Amino acid sequence: LLGDDKILGIFGVYAFFITSGFLVTQSAQFGSVGGFLWRRALRIYPALVVCILLSVYVLGPLFSPLGIRRYLRWSNPLETTVLSVLNPSYGMKLPNVQFYDPAISWLATFTNGSLWSISQEIFCYLILAALMAIGLLRAPFMALALAVGVTWQLFFEHPWPDTQLITDFTFIAPYFFCGSLLWFVMEKWQPNLVLASIFAALGVLCLVFLPAYSYGPMLFAYPLVYIAISPSIQLPTLDRLGDVSYGTYLYGWPVEQVVNHALGQYSTWWTVFGLSLPITLLLGWLSWHLLEKHALRLKRISFLQRQPVSP
């Protein structure tokens, strides 16, 4: 958190949606629509439900001005839990929970601001499933979806970042569609270093001269995918550590809020980051090894019919 209404993590959200669009589109090429949705549900919901339960029943009572008993009695934790599972955005702010003085920052009452993106991610999955069902999960349609999303930003007043910071699907969905389109592109053409360098240079120029443009960072999508899949780049594997990415994403914000509370007047973005990172990675590791990897084994009972989708 940088303060002054700037959230550094938004760049991580961009990368998250680009990567997700790429990988989920790859996953959608085989199997039935039901199988696709089942695999997505297994990836999203087990860790999400546990995170919400910990937020509502641990962080909520500890950081409510009402105290533990009155919080549990007056804040309807069960209703909050159910609504947050059905719509993760609802769990961003818990009733009667405050981590520090709101006069310091407008983020003081946000228990887990990252959950807004989970709702949008689920919506993107449903769109992909619908396209699978009607046979339109193809490159031209994803290009059209991307073009419409970016054009909307150019010609219509967009709420980001002045009015609605974290609730507009039309803001983030184009990043997912961009990742999806890149999967079709990479299926037909090998990743190209020159092209990746050009896009990276354009991305830097856009950030420097058009910093307010919401889709400038999208220019880094091709370089990001190039680094991830190019055979000439050998990235270190994290097999021993496990896939801690999702758990780290879920717990990063709550941990930062707790650290902000603990530091008080000594809270700066670099101290918050430095203290939060190892704690968040530990929680991500626990989430993967105790819950997520076991839940993913259930995908074996899913719908295994091979139904390739034409590009």
Question: Where are the predicted features?
Answer:
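Membrane-interface helix-loop-helix regions
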Residues: L1-I7, F11, Y45-I122, A221, ...
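Transmembrane alpha-helical segments and their boundary/interface "anchor" motifs
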Residues: I10-Y14, S27-N87, Y246-L250, E256, ...
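Hydrophobic cores of alpha-helical transmembrane segments in multi-pass inner/ER membrane proteins
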Residues: Y14-F22, C51, F176-S180, A221-Y222, ...
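Membrane-water interface at transmembrane helix exits
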Residues: T25-Q29, S55-L59, M132, L136, ...
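Alpha-helical transmembrane segments and their membrane-interface exit regions
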Residues: R43-Y45, W152-Q153, F176-W183, A221-P231, ...
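Aromatic-enriched alpha-helical transmembrane segments of multi-pass intramembrane proteins
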Residues: L78-M218, Y251, Q257-I279
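Short, intrinsically disordered terminal tails adjacent to the first/last structured region
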Residues: I301-P311
